[in-house]
Amino acid sequence: MKFLVNVALVFMVVYISFIYAAPEPEPAPEAEAEADAEADPEAGIGAVLKVLATGLPALISWIKRKRQQG
């Protein structure tokens, strides 16, 4: 019984030290982009304009097709 307690204690110490020694996870690309946009507000505006420039014409053509169908 004493052996099992010692094994459990060793396992617990190794597990806890592994958790504390684990490296921090790298931030997601979205979080990095958001942090960059907060640092430079104009970069965020450029990203929004890029999305609007590519997505807005597609949305307008989709609405026109739906109106013609129905």
Curated annotation (Swiss-Prot):
Tissues expressed in: Expressed by the venom gland.
A UniProt-annotated Pfam family: Melittin
A cellular-component GO term for this protein: extracellular region
Swiss-Prot/TrEMBL keywords: Amidation, Antimicrobial, Cytolysis, Formylation, Hemolysis, Ion transport, Membrane, Porin, Secreted, Signal, Target cell membrane, Target membrane, Toxin, Transmembrane, Transport
Phylogenetic classification of the source organism: Eukaryota, Metazoa, Ecdysozoa, Arthropoda, Hexapoda
Assembly, per entry: Monomer (in solution and for integration into membranes), homotetramer (in solution and potentially as a toroidal pore in membranes), and potenially homomultimer (as a toroidal pore in membranes).
Glutamine amide sites (modified residues): Q69
Localization per Swiss-Prot or TrEMBL: Secreted; Target cell membrane
Site note Important for the flexibility at the center of the helix, flexibility that is important for the stability of the voltage-gated pore, residues: P57
Keyword Ion transport tagged: yes
Modified residues (N-formylglycine): G44
UniProt-recorded name of the protein: Melittin
Gene (UniProt): MELT
Stated family: Belongs to the melittin family.
